[in-house]
């Protein structure tokens, strides 16, 4: 078990709910401000940083972002929209399959292209099934995904069972960056009830109430990004709500 995976698993086994801060390098205009935000988020209690974005991220931007985030001492994990997000300055990468994509590229070709780079960079891999729930977001458009019917959590469960059967350890339920609505609580609930997957939930989480509800329903890790960019102090209330769960 790698260092980052061990860090996450031990926290979850100790009964903790985790918070990951998502940083999109394409939206970083001031590296000094990014460092201030990162320090704030670490002080607020975030457990790790994710680096990623659906569009426009260069390896250079990802690298500069990772170097700043690592100053906090927290794990820095690549959340790749594509192989352009890979950087040797991170600690680990969510090695993802976009499970409900119609594109072969996101089902296996991207992983094949990324594998030798990840080996070269000596990044720890966290095998992750990535499922985009809604259809009206940038990630759904880029990834050409089939939306998951909100009223049919059993369809999601079939995806997660398939993920578990092929050896995936993490499942990431994505509403989409800036989504007007979060993942429904019934989704992490059914994953937690019927699988042993570590469940990550992100997108549309803009209030402490929603974050707490998702964590109570079964999410092990809550991811926020847009709210961190807009109002880091509000993000602190989300972290507190998760940690008090």
UniProtKB/Swiss-Prot annotation:
UniProt entry tagged with the keyword Kinase: no
Any one GO cellular component localisation term in the record: cytoplasm
Keyword terms: Cytoplasm, Lipid biosynthesis, Lipid metabolism, Magnesium, Metal-binding, Phospholipid biosynthesis, Phospholipid metabolism, Transferase
Pathway annotation from the record: Membrane lipid metabolism; glycerophospholipid metabolism
Pfam families: PcrB
Main location: cytoplasm
The reaction(s) this protein catalyses: sn-glycerol 1-phosphate + (2E,6E,10E)-geranylgeranyl diphosphate = sn-3-O-(geranylgeranyl)glycerol 1-phosphate + diphosphate
SUPFAM superfamilies hit by this protein: FMN-linked oxidoreductases
Cofactors that this protein relies on: Mg(2+)
Record GO biological process: glycerophospholipid biosynthetic process
InterPro entries: GGGP/HepGP_synthase_I, GGGP/HepGP_synthase_sf, GGGP_HepGP_synthase, GGGP_synth
Binding site for Mg(2+): 24, 54
Annotated compartments: Cytoplasm
Binding site for sn-glycerol 1-phosphate: 172-178, 203-204, 225-226
EC number of the protein: 2.5.1.41
Record-level Gene Ontology MF annotations: magnesium ion binding; phosphoglycerol geranylgeranyltransferase activity
Enzyme class: transferase
PANTHER family, sorted: HEPTAPRENYLGLYCERYL PHOSPHATE SYNTHASE, PTHR40029
Family classification: Belongs to the GGGP/HepGP synthase family. Group II subfamily.
HAMAP family listed in its UniProt record: GGGP_HepGP_synthase
Function: Prenyltransferase that catalyzes the transfer of the geranylgeranyl moiety of geranylgeranyl diphosphate (GGPP) to the C3 hydroxyl of sn-glycerol-1-phosphate (G1P). This reaction is the first ether-bond-formation step in the biosynthesis of archaeal membrane lipids.
Protein name as catalogued: Geranylgeranylglyceryl phosphate synthase
């Amino acid at each position: 078990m790698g260092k980052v995976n061990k860090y996450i698993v031990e926290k979850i086994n100790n009964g903790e709910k985790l918070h990951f801060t998502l940083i999109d390098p394409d939206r970083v205009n001031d590296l000094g401000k990014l460092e201030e935000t990162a320090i704030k988020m670490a002080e607020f209690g975030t457990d790790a940083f994710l680096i990623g974005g659906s569009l426009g991220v260069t390896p250079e931007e990802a690298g500069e972002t990772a170097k700043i985030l690592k100053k906090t001492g927290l794990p820095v994990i690549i959340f790749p929209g594509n192989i352009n997000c890979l950087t040797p300055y991170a600690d680990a990468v969510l090695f993802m399959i976009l499970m409900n994509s119609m594109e072969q590229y996101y089902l296996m070709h991207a992983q094949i292209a990324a594998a030798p780079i990840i080996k070269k960079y000596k990044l720890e891999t966290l095998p992750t099934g990535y499922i985009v729930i809604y259809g009206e977001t940038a990630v759904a458009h880029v990834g050409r995904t089939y939306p998951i019917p909100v009223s049919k959590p059993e369809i999601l469960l079939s995806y997660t069972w398939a993920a578990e059967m092929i050896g995936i350890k993490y499942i990431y339920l994505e509403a989409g960056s800036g989504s007007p609505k979060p993942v429904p609580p019934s989704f992490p609930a059914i994953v937690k009830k019927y699988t042993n997957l570590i469940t990550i939930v992100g997108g549309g989480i803009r209030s402490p109430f929603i974050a707490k509800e998702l964590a109570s329903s079964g999410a092990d890790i809550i991811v926020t990004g847009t709210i961190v960019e807009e109002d880091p102090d509000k993000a602190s209330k989300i972290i507190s709500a998760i940690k008090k769960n």
